From Swiss-Prot:
<dbReference type="InterPro" id="IPR050071">
    <property type="entry name" value="Dehydroquinate_synthase"/>
</dbReference>
<dbReference type="GO" id="GO:0003856">
    <property type="term" value="F:3-dehydroquinate synthase activity"/>
</dbReference>
<keyword id="KW-0479">Metal-binding</keyword>
<protein>
    <recommendedName>
        <fullName>3-dehydroquinate synthase</fullName>
        <ecNumber>4.2.3.4</ecNumber>
    </recommendedName>
</protein>
<keyword id="KW-0963">Cytoplasm</keyword>
<dbReference type="InterPro" id="IPR056179">
    <property type="entry name" value="DHQS_C"/>
</dbReference>
<keyword id="KW-0547">Nucleotide-binding</keyword>
<keyword id="KW-0520">NAD</keyword>
<dbReference type="Pfam" id="PF24621">
    <property type="entry name" value="DHQS_C"/>
</dbReference>
<keyword id="KW-0456">Lyase</keyword>
<feature type="binding site">
    <location>
        <begin position="82"/>
        <end position="87"/>
    </location>
    <ligand>
        <name>NAD(+)</name>
    </ligand>
</feature>
<keyword id="KW-0862">Zinc</keyword>
<feature type="binding site">
    <location>
        <position position="153"/>
    </location>
    <ligand>
        <name>NAD(+)</name>
    </ligand>
</feature>
<dbReference type="InterPro" id="IPR030963">
    <property type="entry name" value="DHQ_synth_fam"/>
</dbReference>
<dbReference type="GO" id="GO:0008652">
    <property type="term" value="P:amino acid biosynthetic process"/>
</dbReference>
<dbReference type="GO" id="GO:0005737">
    <property type="term" value="C:cytoplasm"/>
</dbReference>
<feature type="binding site">
    <location>
        <begin position="140"/>
        <end position="141"/>
    </location>
    <ligand>
        <name>NAD(+)</name>
    </ligand>
</feature>
Length: 375
């Protein structure tokens, strides 16, 4: 039987924080679990800037707002349209202006309620306004629960690249209520599965084996199975972040498996056309093809990865993949060193390595391998 609430610690010294995982504990105004954990995490607070996805304005965001108001906290509510196009300079500026007009100061706390877009945008607003405000994440999508809400990466997109402007800004707390997944559209839920599967490939072979057996139940949103997958994913993310918070040792870069290709797919397709998790799934396939071509692993790894991604109903190929458009975008990837592309590539299930000086013709071949037909 799953406990009513579970916790995972992100160990970063005096900036450590908890990830709370529950089901339905944001629902009750009579038992304000969120407000109590919020106050324990942030301490004294009389003003919250609640930045939320418009899609959850009348559900979990309104419940969070009600609990905080009942605790005597003044709320400034900012609704953000869904989609990657909201991660823009203009949207960030509009948030800053509302914060200024509402009397936001260094004692205020920013609370992000929504998916990865809202978390990234609100986190960067918190990091930059008055040189830094306390920040709390309330992720409402599978992808944001297992990935973007944990680790402190915040930022916005530029026309030429994803997440090109941002900062590391750790939250005071991450509050995951899996009940919010019950209303998440199937496409968005499945998109998040890519990041769950990623953890098995990069770091946890035992978890990957579990996913091979449980992918179908996850798609059905079986509560116990879902809670376990979220907890295991958060444990992996917390472990890697604790070892390399700001990507100085290279350890944290393993979390970018498939992402060099994925970000180029998103940018060339147009933000929002291909969901992030969908792009990551295709990017993982491209990375596996590249690893085979670089003789880092044999084809069985690709076959195992393909089987799990397929079971999760994730895309394996993108018919519009164009190396001529993708390579220039990839040249701006943050893992580029001395003008050379570097890739996170698997050598076996449960382990990846950073590989540099990859010939461009091999990158092109990997892209083309995932263009015309499923693997």
């Amino acid at each position: 039987m799953t406990e009513p609430i579970e916790s995972i610690e992100v160990s970063l010294g005096d900036r450590s924080y908890p990830i709370w995982i529950s089901t339905g504990l944001t629902e009750s105004a009579e038992q304000p679990h969120f407000a109590k954990h919020f106050q324990a995490a942030v301490g004294d607070c009389t003003h919250v800037v609640l930045i939320h996805d418009a899609a959850v304005s009348n559900t979990i965001a309104s419940r969070v707002e009600k609990q905080l108001e009942q605790a005597g906290i003044r709320i400034t509510s900012i609704s953000i349209p869904s989609g990657e196009t909201s991660k823009s300079v203009s949207k960030l500026e509009s948030i800053w202006n509302v914060m200024l007009e509402s009397g936001t100061d260094r004692r205020s706390v920013v609370v992000a309620v929504g998916g990865g877009v809202v978390g990234d945008l609100a986190g960067f607003a918190a990091a930059s306004f008055t040189r830094g405000l306390r920040f709390v994440q309330v992720p409402t999508t599978l992808l944001s629960m297992v990935d973007s809400s944990v680790g402190g990466k915040t930022g916005i997109n530029l026309p030429g690249g994803k997440n090109m402007v941002g900062s590391f800004w750790q939250p005071q707390m991450v509050w995951i209520d899996t009940q919010s997944l019950s209303t998440l559209p199937d496409r968005d839920f499945i998109s998040g599965m890519a990041e769950v599967i990623k953890y098995g490939v990069i770091e946890d072979a035992e978890f990957f084996c579990w996913l091979q057996d449980k992918a179908a139940r996850l798609i059905e949103k079986d509560p116990e199975t879902l809670r376990y997958a979220i907890r295991k994913s958060c444990e992996s993310k917390a472990r890697v972040v604790a070892e390399d918070e700001r990507e100085t040792s290279g350890r944290r870069a393993i979390l970018n498996y498939g992402h060099t290709f994925a970000h180029a797919i998103e940018a060339t397709a147009g933000y929002g056309v291909c969901l992030h998790g969908e792009a990551v799934s295709i990017g993982m396939q491209m990375a596996a093809h590249l690893a085979i071509d670089m003789e880092l692993c044999d084809r069985s790894l690709l076959e195992e990865q393909t089987a799990v991604l397929s079971a999760a109903k994730l895309p394996l190929a993108w018919k519009d993949a164009d190396p001529e458009k993708m390579l220039p975008v990839m040249s701006h990837d943050k893992k580029v060193s001395h003008g050379k592309l570097r890739f996170v590539l698997p050598d076996r299930i449960g382990h990846v390595a950073m590989v540099g000086d990859v010939p461009s013709e091999k990158v092109i071949a990997a892209i083309l391998a995932c263009r015309d037909e499923p693997n």
